[in-house]
């Protein structure tokens, strides 16, 4: 239903307009206060890069963060990552992730980023505290990438990157809750790089698509072509589950059942195992897999995806960030 409201297919969005005007008024006032320096943003002693969205819902932001961190690491840059830690609840903040940190403590996306990149990752509702925690333990870090937080204006940033779903784009264009917008599309004029996941990119936008890898068994680490798996039940607890189901079909998999879950939904053995019957194979997203390691069964697999950016602009962006991190 919410997708139909946000896309404009359902007339119910008009009933939510008063709340959207209120949301826009409050969010605009907050940004204006920082722009006029009525409120002071905290500036880190190293460059900060924000990777965020203008809309609610999954746009492919986390794969972009992983891509960015890995690309900078390959260039010899020491990167730290901070996040709000949605879906997790730590005993205290800031929380610096370790090999023992669970998704219940830090949230699924920070744990995924930590496992994929081995970069220092910290979470806190106050992102400046997370930055301070990283720099205190890892003073050699040269640049901070913040996973989400475009609207977290109390943290000063040097570069802003926005990820857009190229198919859904901005829906009906209205602020939450009548539409998907956290900020209106005009905000793109001040963004340093706009990355478009799928669809047809417009002038000045960087095309991106998600490239699936081999399926990985949660219990054994065995890898295989996902098309070799039989009697598949697909599970996705991400911002936009249909994208994952479409990826499976693109890989030649026709799931017997597709199970969309809420983004950041907590998972347990009983609930997940109930999704599959004897002889079926469960295939989930990597974001779901980090929540299932402790209780995974032998017929549970996940499909990792990597962001693939096209054109000349990604190299220019990486050169800019490398120069920033190097102090040039």
From Swiss-Prot:
Listed EC numbers:
2.7.1.130
Q: List residues binding ATP.
A: 55-62
| Molecular-function GO term, any one | ATP binding
- Enzyme class, broadest EC rank: transferase
**Similarity comment: family membership:** Belongs to the LpxK family.
Q: Per its database record, what is this protein's job?
A: Transfers the gamma-phosphate of ATP to the 4'-position of a tetraacyldisaccharide 1-phosphate intermediate (termed DS-1-P) to form tetraacyldisaccharide 1,4'-bis-phosphate (lipid IVA).
Which pathway does this chain act in?
Glycolipid biosynthesis; lipid IV(A) biosynthesis; lipid IV(A) from (3R)-3-hydroxytetradecanoyl-[acyl-carrier-protein] and UDP-N-acetyl-alpha-D-glucosamine: step 6/6
* Gene Ontology cellular-component terms listed: plasma membrane
Q: List, alphabetically, the InterPro entries matched.
A: LpxK (IPR003758), P-loop_NTPase (IPR027417)
Q: Which UniProt keywords apply?
A: ATP-binding, Kinase, Lipid A biosynthesis, Lipid biosynthesis, Lipid metabolism, Nucleotide-binding, Transferase
Q: Which reaction does it catalyse?
A: a lipid A disaccharide + ATP = a lipid IVA + ADP + H(+)
Q: Which organism is it from?
A: Shigella dysenteriae serotype 1 (strain Sd197)
What is this protein identified as?
Tetraacyldisaccharide 4'-kinase
**GO biological process: one example:** lipopolysaccharide core region biosynthetic process
